[in-house]
Amino acid sequence: MIVDNSGDGRIAGWLQGRAAERLRSIRLDPPLGFAAAVNAGIDAAAGQVVILFDSGVDLTGDAVSPLVNVLSDPSVVVAGPYGLRGQGTPKEFAASRGPEVDAIEGYCMAFRRADAQALEGFDPRFQFYRIADIEFSFRLRDRGGRAVVVPNLPLEKHEHRLWEATDPKERQRLSKRNMYRFLDRWGNRPDLLVGLQGARRAHF
């Protein structure tokens, strides 16, 4: 399934010309914010597992089966190839190979559709994409599950197209707003940081 949130009639025509039984597309007209667009895809999905592939990712093989297999473990609530861990605080995150992490980046992100619907999907206040994936990962994990990195998937990651298409000052403003929104809810929840959990176990 492809969610067309571009507002570009040429893309809509291209997708319509490639419509097939195994390819469905949803056109959002007028375009919505990032989170609302993702939620439209989640609502329209038919499978038990939803895997988000950002337009900045190219598949070079079967990246689906390994992600579905990982989610057969009921303790795993979100998985993907690109993980993040808080650097001692929810205010700063860095890439991590895991295997257990604090959040999965939205470039490629797999989760159960039922879990997403129980949370009412991504927070629609995140109209810009930055931090929305981290916030969604935290809400999934807050229900008692784990975020897990699945390495070596056949993917090629490119620059994020929306990031490149947005004016630098504007993307900085939108990113800061999303981070403040995230911290309003999760800034006082260091218990969700995997690294700090490990430090506490080692200490005691």
Residue ranges and their predicted role:
Residues V50:
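Short aromatic/hydrophobic "clamp" motif used to bind/position activated sugar donors
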Residues D58-F93:
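Conserved donor NDP-sugar-binding/catalytic core segment of glycosyltransferases
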Residues P66-L67, G106-E120, R125-P154:
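A short, conserved alpha-helix in the catalytic core of glycosyltransferases
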Residues V77-P81, R85-G88, R97-P99, A110, ...:
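C-terminal, non-catalytic tails of nucleotide-sugar-dependent glycosyltransferases
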